């Protein structure tokens, strides 16, 4: 009889858990059903079941997910829930761990958009602290829109009316259809790589929810988020916010309004600069007048006599110090000169040349030039050299005396 492997309950449960965890379809599944047995304990977690005519599915929605839930759940409500299927080991049952829940009448496209919006929000793409201010005076404005739409004409007209001569750079792109998300993202990337653009407007001139779908894609949202310069989204829809609106640094209701945000009125800016310059001039004149008045008061004050007298004392002290330093330097120079003269005299007295000058001579060997100090250092017949004050004698020894 073959050996039978017997599993513990926990081993079988763990095996089933691994099976469910490795099934990608069960990691993010949408389920439609009617709520029953809804419980909401003090922990904030929600426990309920989803059922239809043939089956029941246990569900749990933890407090972190249910806290911001706007939908009022109740027994009998038909909903669509998204979550992960896993086994609850204690009871040995599978259940749905719910991440999001929507009314059953919601379309799948709307559910997918809500899921994407929630995910991007968790990643921080909509955070207010990352929004960048628009430049006060942009040199170049980038435009990402259709080259044939009314939105482009409106933005060009308004920009040039507000600031004649401003440079507008168009990166054309389709704004609806299947290729629109890719073209919009690529246009943003090209403007960013080109450099020199201070602000970018991306948008279109309104339309239905389906027409605006390109601006609700993850590709466009991430392209705006990654753009190194401020972006204004102008999708042209007053009520519904697109993902592009949420990610952009500023949102404008229309392309025309976006142009007004991005481009200042030249005359107003010049007037503002003149006002600032005038304020700065008046402020400087006021400060100079205060300084002039203070100086005049100090000049007339008798209190200046004491500092002036102190200054004279200081100058007198410096003059005396200078004289003492010069005198000390001259004295030390004379002492050093006298010492050098004395040393030179001693050296002169000890010099062999001085001895020769007094009539003496130096006798040395002709080969090595060593001076001879005794007659015992030579023999008769050897040659020697005799050095006089003036000249040299080469001699031969005839006789050596003691």
Swiss-Prot record:
Bidirectionally degrades single-stranded DNA into large acid-insoluble oligonucleotides, which are then degraded further into small acid-soluble oligonucleotides. GO terms for cellular component: cytoplasm; exodeoxyribonuclease VII complex. Signal peptide: none annotated. One of its GO terms (molecular function) is nucleic acid binding. Keywords: Cytoplasm, Exonuclease, Hydrolase, Nuclease. PANTHER family: EXODEOXYRIBONUCLEASE 7 LARGE SUBUNIT (PTHR30008:SF0). The keyword Nuclease applies. This is Exodeoxyribonuclease 7 large subunit. It catalyses: Exonucleolytic cleavage in either 5'- to 3'- or 3'- to 5'-direction to yield nucleoside 5'-phosphates. It is found in: Cytoplasm. Transmembrane segments: none annotated. Belongs to the XseA family. CDD domains: ExoVII_LU_OBF. InterPro entries: Exonuc_VII_L (IPR003753), Exonuc_VII_lsu_C (IPR020579), OB-fold_nuc-bd_dom (IPR025824). Its EC number is 3.1.11.6. GO terms for biological process: DNA catabolic process. It comes from Moorella thermoacetica (strain ATCC 39073 / JCM 9320). Heterooligomer composed of large and small subunits.
């Amino acid at each position: 009889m073959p050996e039978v492997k017997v599993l513990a309950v926990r081993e079988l449960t763990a095996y089933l858990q691994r099976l469910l965890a490795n099934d990608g379809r069960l990691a993010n599944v949408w389920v439609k059903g009617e709520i029953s047995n809804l419980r909401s304990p003090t922990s904030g977690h929600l426990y309920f079941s989803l059922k239809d005519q043939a089956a029941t599915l246990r569900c749990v929605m933890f407090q972190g997910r249910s806290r911001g839930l706007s939908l009022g759940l109740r027994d009998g409500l038909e909903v669509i829930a998204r979550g992960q299927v896993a086994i609850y080991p204690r009871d040995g049952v599978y259940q749905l761990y719910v991440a999001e829940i929507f009314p059953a009448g919601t379309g799948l496209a709307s559910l997918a958009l809500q899921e994407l919006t929630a995910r991007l929000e968790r990643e921080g793409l909509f955070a207010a602290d990352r929004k960048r201010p628009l430049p006060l005076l942009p040199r170049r404005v980038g435009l990402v829109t259709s080259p044939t739409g009314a939105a482009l004409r409106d933005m060009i007209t308004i920009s040039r009316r507000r600031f004649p001569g401003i440079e507008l750079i168009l990166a054309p792109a389709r704004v609806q259809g299947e290729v629109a998300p890719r073209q919009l993202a690529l246009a943003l990337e090209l403007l960013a790589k080109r450099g020199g653009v201070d602000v970018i407007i991306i948008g279109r001139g309104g339309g239905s929810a389906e027409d605006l779908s390109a601006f609700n894609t993850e590709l466009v949202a991430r392209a705006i988020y990654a753009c190194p310069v401020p972006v204004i989204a102008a999708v042209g829809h007053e009520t519904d916010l697109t993902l592009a609106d949420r990610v952009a640094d500023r949102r404008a209701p229309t392309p025309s309004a976006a142009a007004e945000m991005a481009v200042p009125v030249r005359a107003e800016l010049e007037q503002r600069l003149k006002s600032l310059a005038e304020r700065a001039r008046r402020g400087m004149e006021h400060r100079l007048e205060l300084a002039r008045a203070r100086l005049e008061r100090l000049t007339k004050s008798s209190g200046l006599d004491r500092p002036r007298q102190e200054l004279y004392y200081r100058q007198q002290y410096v003059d005396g110090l200078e004289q003492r330093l010069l005198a000390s330097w001259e004295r030390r120079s004379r002492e050093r000169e006298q010492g050098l003269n004395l040393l030179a005299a001693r050296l002169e007295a000890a010099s062999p040349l001085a001895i020769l000058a007094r009539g003496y001579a130096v006798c040395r060997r002709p080969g090595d030039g060593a001076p001879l100090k005794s007659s015992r250092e030579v023999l008769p017949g050897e040659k020697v050299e005799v050095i006089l004050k003036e000249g040299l004698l080469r001699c031969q020894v005839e006789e050596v005396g003691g």
